[in-house]
Design a protein with these regions (language model features):
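A structural signal for conserved, well-ordered secondary-structure elements
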Residues: 1-781
Length: 781
């Protein structure tokens, strides 16, 4: 028995996953009186986005009534965005009011959160952080260089001028900075002069020049009487890397805001997640028996590990803001995890029903299932890396690697898309740990236990029963019908968009933000109806909050559109609200006409990111499937993907949901999911080409492969759609339409994905080959 003596692997792996899941969700903490000491952070320590748990709204204005230009406001917006991402605050909205020189920022925070201080964050975000190196020890000494000549700054710990270790900041200059610093140190070295380093008007270090420094590097150290802490150097490096603000900022207003998805959004999603997981366990166990049940244990570990990378469970990884797009990334990663296990279980079942022994079926199933898993996951990794490179901080690894693609857009960030890429990349990499490695260890361990060696437990038919032969579907024969359906569907969606119009959120169009104060309790849904009538706009979004300085209850009304809101319109709004709700005493606090947080440049950059991702995927498919004409197949997969993306777009249009950052996340999710589905089908075609020989007609090869892949593709989609369906039902029960309008388009896109993977991409590929063959025959004739 080949697997004898490995039963302990099953027990140990299950116990390790169970312990990890428990600690990842609940953490480890000890309470000493009124003080709680957290040793391991759990899911409750995750910093959720504004959409889920609420946050802080702060308005910055130039200090001392400085008259900032539009270009300076744009530059300040970019610096603040980089600082937010540097703080791992990825869910934020930042708008510019050019008329009144205001920067309006909203970012997540919950009262009672202990490891994130919003006031300290606001202070850091709004500080000028102008770094200068000067000759001598005074602030008016001759300028040597400034922060614009610093290529990178890194917080370090170690010995500097002796055996004692200390915290310091290591700087690397660009060519201009290296020359300026080299010239200055060469000059001052001769006279034992000094160089002082200033951050704004604060002297952070002064040192005597003991040697000429021409290697383009320097360090910032502290004085012996006031040594740097780790927090000091991390903050300083972060500020230097994000750049200096073009003018000093002051806080004009500061208030807390409610969750944009609704007060019960987190509870609803937790409930939906538990129900969905229970249904997946039942379905996988019924379909695949023991491998299906063990796969669900591994899936729990994968979900827990993804949340652990977000919560700060691992001390080497800082906590990350979890937003609705971030959750979409986790959902896609879960779908990939289920898919990996379905592929393996289907292969084992197939080998058993072909007459192989249990050990032989496991060995062959694992080997044959690994290749499609790798190919499918690589395509998702490509998408995640491109997104993190395009929308992450400019000093990030992926941003530097992809600078040649996105340099024309300048340094810019989009935290929610970056968070989507982060959770997606983390989840997919963890899929190899849990969905591939852990599942296989557990199955091998189970197969070594005598009581668990019955082939039926692994998917085989019972002894004496024959495998039912299923009549194959003639997918290839229906190819013209499939392509006609897709063409008509896309035409119908374009027609609907033209007839009903496409609504855009404030993030894309800009618009107005009206902040009111009120007393007592209000129903935001009822107030929204009144406000929509008064302002003649049905695209309003409302958020309640509390002004930190005055204690007043606040209501923020966001109104997308190109037209500005006048004071007369606000007065009409107040009149309508106070007539309808006289006890609430609505009053105006502020009015801002803002620019788009995600404007034309964002849409252009998103398009470039998607096109570049598809190009890389096309090249990968062409390389991996070159023996079967993979480049053509890749092109057909990309064309079929347009069908899925149009379905998502059409669903948003029909639901009358404004297009925003969540729409971009939904489109990217379907892009990754659908491409993975198609790649797995292509992998089966490649495998069958080797088995069936080159003389087998391409139509027959494709038809046979699609029929073999159909069950796996449908089951994977059913499990993921089931999870999204539960989310839709629960969100409706809780009255959370904003979650429904995100989950439902995802669900429709995934249903479209299974259709295009089986029916459209392969049909288009066969049709292309048909025409190519006919042209070749015509030339011969």
């Amino acid at each position: 028995m080949k697997t004898k003596g490995k039963a302990w692997q099953l027990v140990v792996t299950v116990l390790l996953i169970a312990a990890f899941v428990y600690t990842a969700f609940f953490g480890v903490a000890v309470k000493y009186g009124d003080v709680t000491k957290i040793y391991i952070k759990g899911a409750q320590d995750i910093r959720f986005g504004v959409d889920i748990k609420g946050g802080v709204n702060v308005t910055f204005a130039p200090s001392d009534n400085y008259d900032a230009t539009d270009d300076q406001l744009d530059a300040a917006q970019l610096v603040i965005e980089n600082r937010l991402v540097g703080l791992n605050v990825t869910d934020y909205e930042l708008y510019v009011d050019y008329d009144s020189d205001r920067l309006i920022l909203e970012f997540p925070w919950q009262s009672g959160e202990t490891d994130f201080d919003p006031e300290a964050a606001i202070e850091e975000i709004g500080s000028t952080a102008y770094l200068t190196f000067r000759k001598g020890s005074s602030a008016d000494g001759e300028l040597i260089l400034d922060g614009s000549m610093v290529e990178s700054a890194a917080a370090q710990y170690g010995p500097v001028s002796g055996s004692t270790s200390e915290y310091y900041v290591a700087l690397k200059f660009n060519d201009e900075g290296a020359k300026a610093f080299g010239d200055a140190t060469t000059e001052l070295y001769q006279s034992s002069g000094t160089i002082s380093i200033w951050l704004d008007d604060q002297n952070v270090s002064t040192a005597t020049v003991n040697a000429a420094i021409t290697d383009g590097a320097a360090i910032i150290t502290s004085s012996a009487s006031n040594p740097f802490t780790q927090e000091d150097v991390v903050k300083m490096a972060r500020q230097i890397n994000s750049g200096a603000l073009p003018f000093a900022l002051t806080v004009d207003s500061y208030s807390t805001v409610s969750p944009s998805l609704g007060e019960n959004s987190l509870s609803a999603m937790v409930l939906a997640g538990l129900i969905a997981y229970a249904l997946i366990v039942v379905l996988m166990t019924l379909l695949y028996r023991l491998p299906g049940f063990l796969a669900c244990i591994a899936l729990a570990g994968q979900v827990a590990a993804t949340l652990a990378f977000v919560s700060g469970y691992f001390p080497v990884f800082e906590s990350f803001t979890l937003t609705l797009p971030g959750i979409a990334g986790i959902i896609l990663a879960i779908g990939m995890g289920v898919d990996a296990n379905v592929i393996t279980a289907e292969r084992i079942k197939e080998e058993l029903n072909n007459g192989k022994s249990l050990d032989g079926a496991l060995k062959s199933g694992f080997a044959r299932g690994l290749t499609p898993i790798i190919d499918g996951n690589v395509t998702i990794v490509i998408v995640a890396i491109v997104l993190m490179g395009a929308f992450g901080p400019s000093d990030g690894l992926f941003a530097k690697a992809l600078h040649f693609v996105f340099f024309a857009f300048g340094p810019s960030t989009a935290g929610t898309i970056y968070a989507f890429g982060y959770t997606l990349l983390t989840g997919v990499l963890l899929n190899f740990v849990f969905g591939v490695f852990a599942t296989r260890v557990m199955i091998r361990g189970a197969a070594s236990i005598k009581a668990l060696r019955n082939p039926w437990l692994y998917g085989a038919v019972k002894p004496g029963k024959e495998v039912k032969e299923k009549k194959p579907i003639d997918f290839v024969g229906l190819r013209k019908r499939f392509l006609t359906i897709s063409t008509c569907l896309m035409a119908a969606i374009i027609l609907c968009a033209a007839v009903f119009g496409v609504r855009l959120d404030t993030e894309f169009t800009g618009g107005a933000m009206i902040t009111l104060s009120y007393q007592g309790e209000i129903s935001t849904s009822e107030v929204q109806k009144t406000a929509s009538t008064a302002l003649e706009n049905n695209g309003l979004t409302l958020q309640t909050g509390k002004n930190v300085a005055t204690g007043e209850q606040t209501l923020k009304i966001s109104m997308p559109g190109n037209e500005t809101v006048t004071t007369d319109q606000v007065e009409n709004l107040l009149t309508s609200l106070n007539e309808q709700y006289p006890d609430n005493a609505f009053a105006q606090l502020s009015l801002s006409n803002v620019s788009a947080a995600m404007g034309t440049k964002f849409l252009q950059k998103s398009l470039v990111a998607v096109v570049f991702s598809l190009l890389l995927i096309l090249l990968y498919i062409g390389f991996r499937f070159k023996k079967i004409g993979g480049l053509t197949g890749g092109l057909m997969a990309v064309l079929a993907l347009l069908n899925d993306l149009m379905v998502v777009f059409g669903t948003f249009v029909l639901l009358r949901t404004p297009l925003d950052g969540n729409f971009i996340a939904a489109m990217l999710t379907i892009l990754g999911y659908s491409i993975n589905d198609t790649v797995v089908v292509y992998d089966r075609i490649r495998e069958n080409r080797a088995l069936m020989g080159k003389k087998t007609p391409f139509e027959e090869l494709v038809n046979h492969s699609v029929n073999q892949s159909a069950r796996r593709t449908i089951i994977t989609t059913v499990t993921t759609v089931m999870a999204l369906g539960v989310m839709c039902v629960v969100s409706k029960l809780y009255g959370l339409d904003s979650i429904f309008t995100f989950a439902f388009p995802l669900m429709m896109g995934m249903l479209s994905g299974v259709y295009t993977s089986l029916c459209v991409s392969t049909s288009a590929w066969v049709l292309w080959n048909d025409r190519k063959s006919k042209k070749a025959e015509t030339k011969k004739a």
